[in-house]
Amino acid sequence: TFTQAKRIAWDYVKYYAGVIPGVSFNETELRVDFPNGGRLMLLSAENPDSLRGIYLDMCAFDEFGMQNPRVWGEVVRPALSDREGAAIFLGTPAGHNHFYDLLETAKSQIDEGSDQWYYKIVKASESKLVKDEELKAARAQMTPEQYEQEYECSFTAAIIGAYYGKLISDAEDNGRVTRVPYDPMYPVHTAWDLGINDSTAIWFA
């Protein structure tokens, strides 16, 4: 929301941009005007239609998985096209939602040789931004699923009814879940675990 943008990010924007000579800040619109004509704005994704009509050179989504997916597909993506702009997506996993789908798209595009995509998964245990003692304390006070999602970037932990979530996460971490070449001339067999109140799993062989 607009209030969250102001509370969480606005002070950082002013701190880092304030050292630029000639820069000005609009507190009402959460807008920064640079002396070269450039502009930076903090916007709310709460109402996608309120963003229509803007033009963008770059857009950064924070906690993309918590936002309405219409914002990207119907508003921001078209706004970037005529200026050949770019987008950055940041967030915390929350199951197999549109943030997960975007990550899978990035992986697929990179596998196909595209240089227009990049992704990075930063786990707390690897980044060392959080001390090991704090991670140990958090692990002791949270369920394994909560810890894996919030600290270790697990998209599987948050899926209700994912009985094999931990096993799948371990398989992914160990490189046992990957893409393999296949011959379209051979038949493919599938086994379906139909999800009623949770996700459907499909195995291919």
Question: Which sequence ranges carry the predicted segments?
Answer:
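Phosphate/NTP-binding elements of NTP-utilizing enzymes
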Residues: 1-205
